[in-house]
Amino acid sequence: MTTPANAQNASKTWELSLYELHRTPQEAIMDGTEIAVSPRSLHSELMCPICLDMLKNTMTTKECLHRFCSDCIVTALRSGNKECPTCRKKLVSKRSLRPDPNFDALISKIYPSREEYEAHQDRVLIRLSRLHNQQALSSSIEEGLRMQAMHRAQRVRRPIPGSDQTTTMSGGEGEPGEGEGDGEDVSSDSAPDSAPGPAPKRPRGGGAGGSSVGTGGGGTGGVGGGAGSEDSGDRGGTLGGGTLGPPSPPGAPSPPEPGGEIELVFRPHPLLVEKGEYCQTRYVKTTGNATVDHLSKYLALRIALERRQQQEAGEPGGPGGGASDTGGPDGCGGEGGGAGGGDGPEEPALPSLEGVSEKQYTIYIAPGGGAFTTLNGSLTLELVNEKFWKVSRPLELCYAPTKDPK
């Protein structure tokens, strides 16, 4: 089957684009007019798109008229990409290329000494590489020094875990005779108007008169009894203070808290506790790692201490008081009658605090304001707050005497 002649002629016709139809040839400059060209635009015109360097042995594609270095375009065609690197037009082989000596002559006219130009380029590249390496080295050294300083500062500021467990509710039990040597100093430092601090739990031989705990009825912070008796100073040291070690020197920074502080309201159970003199609301501030057993032990110590203080204040003539048969306000015990020395009758034995246990009181919580839930003694206050409370106000707990303490 033969192809018509008009079809063959149509296939050989070059269809012009709209731009090609409207373009006009530029007039040649025949006089001595000079046109200034910027180095940037000149470099972009003389640069090979493959090696990004000045064209060398220029080869031009026959289809799209793009220029490349001879070695660059031949290597590109050998790699299997049979297309123009600039416009992706199909290039069958090296036959689709032609040399462009006119462009080489133009380059040699602009840059007469090609070797000098290449040597200058090499010097610039070497200098840039050296400066870049020096800057990278200096920046790396500075970054390393900065990281070392930061890690060193973190090691210095890192708190020692468990360093302040002695004065919080979660602290261990001290020896029974720790407060005997400095009774007056400790009792004076633990006055109710001293600086607040979390000290709900006290050593086994002491009380719980810390200034961070307030009561609805105005809890006492120490014993104000007879100054002439020998055991009043001991009681003041063991009951009023609560510090388990030598005092910190003035100006020394206090150790950081092991956990976040938790404020809680301690109320008597409305159904299990009868109204009495020891059923006031108590406000406690302590750390989150304190447990429910710590609260129970603190409550038992606090109530036992208050009863002991009231027993001391309620005796006729006071502890070690003078003549109680003379009558008058000075003769009835309390804080005023204890200054007479040891001439009076022998002081009766006061109730001991050694038998105080965390089993004497049970702690409850009402999450929704309804039913009360008994708290396990091993739970921490932080866990209780997250599990049962979940509101942004002080934790509210209730206490009641244990019916059958074991």
From Swiss-Prot:
- Where, per UniProt, does this protein localize? Nucleus; Nucleus speckle
Where do Acidic residues bias regions lie?
A: 175-187
In this UniProt entry, the residues modified to Phosphothreonine are T24, T215, T220
Q: Name one GO biological process term.
A: protein ubiquitination
SUPFAM superfamilies attached here?
RING/U-box (SSF57850)
- Where does the record place the modification Phosphoserine? S38, S140, S187, S190, S229, S232, S248, S254
Alphabetized UniProt keyword annotations: Chromatin regulator, Metal-binding, Nucleus, Phosphoprotein, Repressor, Transcription, Transcription regulation, Transferase, Ubl conjugation pathway, Zinc, Zinc-finger
ZnF RING-type: positions = 48-88
Spans of biased composition, class Pro residues?
Answer: 246-258
Record-linked PROSITE patterns: ZF_RING_1, ZF_RING_2
User: Locations of Gly residues compositional bias?
Assistant: 205-228, 235-244, 315-343
Keyword Cell division part of the UniProt annotation: no
Chain residue ranges for the region called Necessary for interaction with CBX2: 230-406
Q: In which pathway does it act?
A: Protein modification; protein ubiquitination
Q: Which InterPro entries match?
A: RAWUL, RING1/RING2, Znf_RING, Znf_RING/FYVE/PHD, Znf_RING_CS
Q: Which domain of life is it from?
A: Eukaryota
Look at the named UniProt entry and state the broad enzyme category this protein falls under: transferase
Output one GO MF annotation: ubiquitin-protein transferase activator activity
What is the catalytic activity of this protein?
S-ubiquitinyl-[E2 ubiquitin-conjugating enzyme]-L-cysteine + [acceptor protein]-L-lysine = [E2 ubiquitin-conjugating enzyme]-L-cysteine + N(6)-ubiquitinyl-[acceptor protein]-L-lysine
Q: How does it assemble?
A: Component of chromatin-associated Polycomb (PcG) complexes. Interacts with BMI1. Part of the E2F6.com-1 complex in G0 phase composed of E2F6, MGA, MAX, TFDP1, CBX3, BAT8, EUHMTASE1, RING1, RNF2/RING2 MBLR, L3MBTL2 and YAF2. Interacts with CBX2 and PCGF6. Component of a PRC1-like complex. Component of repressive BCOR complex containing Polycomb group subcomplex at least composed of RYBP, PCGF1, BCOR and RNF2/RING2. Interacts with PCGF2, RNF2; CBX6, CBX7 and CBX8. Interacts with PHC2. Interacts with MN1. Interacts with USP26.
Supply the name of the protein. Answer: E3 ubiquitin-protein ligase RING1
Native organism: Homo sapiens
Q: What is the lineage of its organism?
A: Eukaryota, Metazoa, Chordata, Craniata, Vertebrata
